Amino acid sequence: MRLDGVHKEYGDAKALDGMSLELRAGDAVAVMGPSGCGKSTLLNMVAGLDRPTSGAVEVHGQDLGKLNETGLALFRRRHIGMIFQFFNLIDDLPALDNVALAAQLTGTSARQSRRRALELLDELGIADRKDTYPAALSGGERQRVAVARALMNRPALLLADEPTGALDSRSGEQVMDLLIDLNQIGQTLLIVTHDPHLATRCASRLIEVADGRVARESALEPSA
């Protein structure tokens, strides 16, 4: 993943001001900074949820600016996984169907999608909750369902926006363990967080953002 001189303006306001950074396959990078510094805009650019005013965003060798809206949506579903603070699950679908839907939207058959979804729920330790609706799941269980959904299409890049922000301490630690395990088997991670503990536990590199730019970049020593 690469950002090259990315600017994003909303009217007279500059959200990103020449942002440049690069992740290699297998990297685990945390992004931190004060509210309004451009972290969320950065994540939206990488996810293809918003387009830069100028500059280039490249993911998995693809310049996102060269894709039309339909192509961008399909690319995102196939190659980018996303985990959100508040889970973004569909209340009317049980856990298994919430996960399987991610693959069905790329054209995978319902049968194959459900089989893959069940495998992921089993790997994440919640296969016994496959028929449970989100409202009946704990916060930690809901985030595991969200992680399974994000992994359905074997994404080149996994984006996490405050992935433990809505969880209690125990559930948050479990999600951190999960992110570490994923990175250890080669999953590339970009994590936006306000939590220094999450950053030092789950990432090997820290990007500090201020005023829409990379203010500092540093290596992180793993913490327990």
Task: Annotate the PLM regions.
Residues D211-P222:
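Conserved switch/coupling elements of ABC/ABC-like ATPase nucleotide-binding domains
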Residues S109, S223-A224:
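Alpha-helix capping and helix-coil boundary motifs
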Residues M1-A203, E208-A210:
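ABC family nucleotide-binding domain
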